[in-house]
Amino acid sequence: MSGETTPTPTPTKNDPTTRAVGSPRAERVAHALARDVRLPDGAGTLALVTIDNGLDHTKPTTFGPTGIAELTATLTSVRDRVRAGEVQAVAVTGKPYYLAAGADLTQVAGVTSREEALALGRGGHAAYGLLHDMGVPTFAFVNGVALGGGFELALNCDYRTAAADVRALALPETGLGLVPGWGGAYLVPRLVGVQDALDVILTRPAANKPFTAQQAERIGLVDVVLDTADFLEESVRWAARVLRGEVVVPRRELDDEATWRAVTDAARARLDATIHGSRPAPYRALDLVAHARDRSREEAFAAEDEALADLILSDEMRASVYAFGLVSGGKRPVGAPDAALARPVTRVGIVGAGLMAAQIALLLAQRLGVPVVMRDLDDERVAKGLEAVRSGVERLTSTGRLSPAAASRLLGSVRGTTDLADLADCDLVIEAVTEVLSLKKRVFAEVEQVVSPDAVLATNTSALSVTQMAADLQHPERVVGLHFFNPVAAMPLVEVVQAERTSPEALATGFAVASRLRKTAVLVADRPGFVVNRLLVLLLGVIVDAVEKGTPVEVADRALRPLGLPMPPFELFDLVGPAVGLHVLTSLREDLGERFPRSPGLARLVEDGTTVVLPAAGKGLPKPVDPAIQATFDAAREAEPLGEPLDEAGVLDSVLTALTREIGHMLDEGVVATPQQIDLCMILGAGWGFHLGGITPYLDRTGCSERVLGRRLLPDGVANVPTA
């Protein structure tokens, strides 16, 4: 297998991953246009300022230096009219679908000096401060998406209305290596209380969960939710009622000092337990919130300016903006063939009815809106698969994401069978059986006998050769890999695998299906483990190898804390299952050589039937290691010594060295066209944080890439503060 020649994905001219993702582009200026609106019932004149970049809804309104300067000029002019007695209220709103999406990140990433960074924060504070100092009531009519500095624009107003269909209100800065820098870290805890503020500023950004208008109203971020159809008119009427005293919006008292301290101390402990100091932004944001109770507005905003300037000039922020650019550009997949070549998919077959098969079947039925048939060997397996689909539909219904009528239609579109002939009229058949090459080959051979010559065959294999799987078929060109990740509905990545003889039509169909499923598709060559599993399994292999050499399990498990990964290695092992982990590690060792360590201790655990390495801990307690697990590794080492134990730093260095070397091999083999695609896969398929930029920016900034490969993986300044 290691000697096979596979097609190498080729970057295209417009490939977003081959340019400096965080490099500045020309500012899309957010214009601030003021007009007068006559308030009803003689309440006076409202100056309505609309933020609009003059582009369609696919180009969100963001603020760069010119936009902030224009907003400052417009609000200054409005304030002059207020002082002249011409205006009794001021409101801000946005173009259709957007209030504003915050600061222009490409402009932020272009900042190279502390003076520029400080000016960015101070400029926003000065502009928004005009709303606070206007001298008449100010309103934000939140008609659409309001993120970061866009939402802070609203927070600096006295009152906020929101349209009922608004689904994205957030301060996502800490997820991008920044802090809310235009008032949010001070205003939110004083508006909604310190506990809810930390949800807004820390918890939801980490989970990428913005607020809907209704959720924001419940905690007091907005004051009223109004019907979308006539939102602007209703907002104006509501503002008039506020001015006449008919509507009084209550504001909560500040939390007492003891509560404030207890909540922020608990939040700091949670950060220590989860990200272990790996990311500065959440800690800086927490510091700002912790002092928001007792600082004056001026002191708090000056502290925001300092924190923002520090973070803008950090590698973590540059990596985060780079990662954001990768994910944003991921919907335009690199190397995908002409979409017009894709075959129509009106009916899908799934071979297998296990957990992954059922998840794939449900998602296909839901997103493609086509009939799906699951086939397995006996009625019992088919029944289990259908029950898994039913449970998934019930979860969607119970959370309000499906109406009862839609749920009934969805259930009716998925059926099970033991008869292979029921797949005959499927345009696409996906196999999702056990990871055994001979079994998958047999499945494809059987399916090919009943489907049409134009039907596309796809495999959900996570590591096996798609080329070998298709080798004995009459039409191997119809086979493509579609590697979904578990849980299928939640994980946004699909690795689309181009085998040696995959046709452009089959490949285009794979990309089209991934797009209709709202997944980000990355083209990968048919090499063992593809991208995500090749790197994750190597990481786990190196960790286990350290334990084989005498490193205690707890030490090895803690070693990767500086990376701030979504879960420690042995927790990931427990999620995958020791047996599956051993199987894939052994398979990759056979295909790729001794870079993938063997593990006698892990083999013994599997022989003993062990399914969990770290038993579940009590709430708030660290997960303990079962002494029997450590004893098994110790016994295996006594029988066959493999080396010397390592400390945490040694384990981390071993992991980073191995990952760097493997990425070098992957690029040489053409598994993907660019390092950026590896980063995109690790972000979306392994949940690695934006602060890492995936993986290659971290390897560059720690010097691993130059030490191991003799070169950087990315150009200097693409995902880091330029060193020159």
Each model region followed by its residue ranges:
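Amphipathic alpha-helical interaction surfaces in cytosolic regulatory modules
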Residues: 71, 83, 96-110, 128-131
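Conserved catalytic cysteine-centered active-site region
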Residues: 128-140
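Short, active-site-adjacent cap segments at secondary-structure transitions
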Residues: 97-101, 147-148, 464-465
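STAS-typified acidic loop motif
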Residues: 42-69, 96
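Long, basic N-terminal domains or extensions that often function
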Residues: 151
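A short, well-ordered alpha-helical element
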Residues: 61-87
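N-terminal glycine-rich phosphate-binding loop for ADP-containing cofactors
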Residues: 3, 9-12, 19-44, 52-54, ...
